[in-house]
From Swiss-Prot:
<feature type="binding site">
    <location>
        <position position="141"/>
    </location>
    <ligand>
        <name>Ni(2+) 1</name>
    </ligand>
</feature>
<dbReference type="InterPro" id="IPR017951">
    <property type="entry name" value="Urease_asu_c"/>
</dbReference>
<dbReference type="GO" id="GO:0016151">
    <property type="term" value="F:nickel cation binding"/>
</dbReference>
<feature type="binding site" description="via carbamate group">
    <location>
        <position position="224"/>
    </location>
    <ligand>
        <name>Ni(2+) 2</name>
    </ligand>
</feature>
<keyword id="KW-0533">Nickel</keyword>
<comment type="similarity">
    <text>Belongs to the metallo-dependent hydrolases superfamily. Urease alpha subunit family.</text>
</comment>
<feature type="modified residue" description="N6-carboxylysine">
    <location>
        <position position="224"/>
    </location>
</feature>
<keyword id="KW-0963">Cytoplasm</keyword>
<dbReference type="InterPro" id="IPR011059">
    <property type="entry name" value="Metal-dep_hydrolase_composite"/>
</dbReference>
<dbReference type="InterPro" id="IPR017950">
    <property type="entry name" value="Urease_AS"/>
</dbReference>
<dbReference type="Pfam" id="PF01979">
    <property type="entry name" value="Amidohydro_1"/>
</dbReference>
<feature type="binding site">
    <location>
        <position position="367"/>
    </location>
    <ligand>
        <name>Ni(2+) 1</name>
    </ligand>
</feature>
<dbReference type="InterPro" id="IPR005848">
    <property type="entry name" value="Urease_asu"/>
</dbReference>
<dbReference type="InterPro" id="IPR006680">
    <property type="entry name" value="Amidohydro-rel"/>
</dbReference>
<comment type="subunit">
    <text>May form a heterohexamer of 3 UreC (alpha) and 3 UreAB (gamma/beta) subunits. May also form a heterotrimer of UreA (gamma), UreB (beta) and UreC (alpha) subunits. Three heterotrimers associate to form the active enzyme.</text>
</comment>
<feature type="binding site">
    <location>
        <position position="143"/>
    </location>
    <ligand>
        <name>Ni(2+) 1</name>
    </ligand>
</feature>
<dbReference type="InterPro" id="IPR050112">
    <property type="entry name" value="Urease_alpha_subunit"/>
</dbReference>
Amino acid sequence: MPELSRTAYADLFGPTTGDRVRLADTDLFVEIEEDRSGGPGRSGDEAVFGGGKVLRESMGQGRTTRAQGAPDTVITGALIIDHWGIVKADIGIRDGRITGIGKAGNPDTMDGVHPDLVIGPETEIVAGNGKIVTAGGIDTHVHFIAPGAVDEALASGVTTLIGGGTGPAEGSKATTVTPGAWHLAWMFAALESSPVNIGFLGKGSTMSKESMRDQLRAGVLGFKIHEDWGATPAVISACLDVCEESGVQLAVHSDTLNEAGFVGDTFDAVAGRTLHAFHVEGAGGGHAPDMITAVSLPNMLPASTNPTRPHTVNTVEEHLDMLMVCHHLNPAVPEDLAFAESRIRPSTIAAEDILHDMGAISIMSSDAQAMGRIGEVILRTWQTAHVMKRRRGFLPGDTRADNLRARRYVAKYTINPAVAQGIEHEVGSVETGKLADLVLWDPRFFGAKPQLVIKGGQIAYAQMGDANASIPTPQPVLPRPMYGALGTAPATNSVNFVSEQAVEDGLPERLGLGRAFVPIRSTRGRTKADMRQNDALPRVEVAADSFAVTIDGELVEPAPVTELPLAQRYFLF
């Protein structure tokens, strides 16, 4: 029987089991662990679309109708990178959800076709052969300041935005809070036509539990406590009381100035309850200089914001100006300048790199337009992974490729933020039953520029050439909105995540909007152990005088890098 070389097979059908794929211009490689769509011993029946190819009537395409269960769309032969593994498979989508991961085709002519991946005449095909698929990104730290941030997020592969704001008001420029029923109602309406899932954080900086309960009924999915509104131990404890009774999450930006207490006082106020610790390194805010010690506690779900990722020769300098703008400070006021300088510490930024690689910091987010870049969550995650690969070599368990590291880092912006906010039953991974929020990448552009962004089964964003050209590819090829981002389509492909109390109180009926309101699942009792691939609890200590950081007794030596992948090679500006 004639055989194909691995090179020829990869050219025709994409890489298969045992092949390695380089991720863009990084030093990271992934090795395919399993090929569910074909590969060695199963070649010959791969689902491939095109002239003279397999997916034609009575060949790879059968007669199964949509009413009989055929999927609406099949992504063929894609390399899935997810927290659970690195596998190649066909992916079926039906009614906006993932229905099958395996082998697609026509069981009348092919062996091993997954029963939920039977291709019929009503099935669309997306060619994933030679491409990578990841789950849509989830950003849990979004300031809703400029509407254009939604486009930037989508163009980068982020499909779920959680945070707060009402536009460029001072409160929103500094804090991720949408305060009160009136603001929440019109912000839900404003984002109705945006093809992203939305979740708003309410103001937890209050001793009024009744106000917090009102905000829950008005549609918040959780609360945010921020030092600019007040982050005292009493406020934290009161808000967590409401979180415990309602099941929602509390995200905290703690007291940088240590005015109302030190980091230990905040930990005492939390009292072992689950908490989502924002920008835990501290440059984005939080007890100076030792907020980073929160990574040692099992009840803390720690996150980074992306401007400190990874530590480069430019990181410290750019942060001072960012701080002045974001927190309404005046560089001519000595106290304001001291406030800013206390937050920017090379030692803790350097430690943040290592803690990510150890799996001790579980989540990556943006802090969009408030000391963070919404379009760089994914990019900076993989830049950090690259820097750590160069510095620390393979992770234990990795030898020929970086599968464990890839699974660890992809989890930071997909499944782990979903778990932290109680939405992992709907989004956060490439698994059956979940919303088909999927990102298709050319491996050469992985982490930088998605080829397609699929939102609830609909193509919402894509790299697309001149619309007046004779084919889709002539320059300028740019990330552009597609039909899934137009008209009323976003109301069918995206959801609003809210508290269960909001749904029970009739919020969807009161607002009368088109998209579904989906209640979160309880976040209470969740711990670091629930953070996929990122559950490490090292002992971290920070010297009060020098800010020197030790991790499990080992001193961290700052080594800012001068060059990164996924940078000027991919972007003019």
